């Protein structure tokens, strides 16, 4: 994979050295009369991993400069790498082979220096999340972690010295639907009281205040949302054990329906005939 720099003058990319990695064979049996084995380097438990590194090269050509990320490259994964907007720096996430420690580096593509700004740990296992959005003119960013026992979104300063909880509460954030820096909110799905029901909540990105429930309280069940980029509108889906899925376009601020897209009326009639209890 590769990433263009914000100014389009450089490319940061991964290089994978698969020497010594065992071969796994996939079978291609779809485009000819006879199947063909396709060799693919693929490590198994306890065997050698690929050695992966991240480098930077000018878009005009020339030599690649490599980041000297600490640690054995065959026992660590450079799982994520992205340019920080409007800068010559990249953020690199380094996951150990046990996948319970995520070390976050900021690398300067001019000097090739590295700074560890954050290390997230778990006794068992860490998921890699793609919920990073830069805020406050790249002075801070959002970060997903289970550090307090719940899956929550945090606001972290660029130097990693400050970390503030955004989605405060005794619940897991099931899904991040929209991070809206302009409006100052993050919208997410959670089930604080009943795991069979999912609702949309929002919390302030500055970490102040309590979580606000966006979904109507009088509609118990499963809610899902596809939110517009400006967080003003959404495609809202609702269903429960006795209500077939109902889909509509809504004003997200008021949750007022703008247009009904699908109400599954025929199915709702058939379900009503069954006389199921609520």
Model feature map: region roles:
Residues 1-13:
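Hydrophobic or amphipathic alpha-helical targeting/insertion segments
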């Amino acid at each position: 994979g590769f990433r263009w720099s914000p100014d389009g003058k450089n490319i940061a990319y991964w290089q994978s050295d698969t020497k010594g990695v065992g071969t796994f064979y996939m079978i291609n049996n779809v485009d000819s009369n006879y199947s063909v084995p396709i060799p693919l380097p693929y490590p198994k438990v306890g065997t050698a991993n690929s050695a992966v590194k991240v480098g930077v090269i000018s878009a005009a050509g020339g030599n690649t400069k490599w980041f000297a990320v600490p640690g054995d490259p065959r026992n660590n994964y450079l799982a994520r790498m992205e340019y920080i907007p409007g800068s010559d720096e990249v953020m690199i996430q380094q996951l150990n082979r046990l996948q319970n420690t995520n070390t976050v580096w900021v690398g300067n593509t001019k000097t090739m220096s590295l700074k560890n700004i954050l290390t997230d740990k778990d006794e068992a296992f860490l998921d890699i999340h793609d919920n990073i959005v830069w805020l406050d003119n790249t002075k801070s960013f959002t970060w997903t972690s289970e550090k307090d026992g719940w899956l929550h979104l945090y606001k972290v300063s660029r130097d990693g010295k400050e970390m503030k909880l955004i989605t405060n509460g005794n619940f897991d954030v099931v899904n991040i639907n929209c991070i809206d820096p302009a409006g100052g909110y993050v919208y997410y799905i959670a089930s604080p009281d009943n795991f069979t029901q999912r609702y949309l909540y929002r919390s302030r990105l500055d970490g102040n205040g309590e979580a606000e429930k966006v979904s109507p309280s009088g509609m118990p069940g499963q809610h899902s949302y596809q939110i517009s980029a400006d967080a003003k509108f959404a495609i809202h889906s609702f269903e429960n054990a006795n209500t077939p899925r109902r889909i509509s376009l809504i004003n997200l601020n008021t949750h007022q329906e703008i247009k009904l897209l699908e109400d599954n009326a025929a199915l709702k009639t058939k379900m009503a005939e069954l006389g199921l209890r609520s």
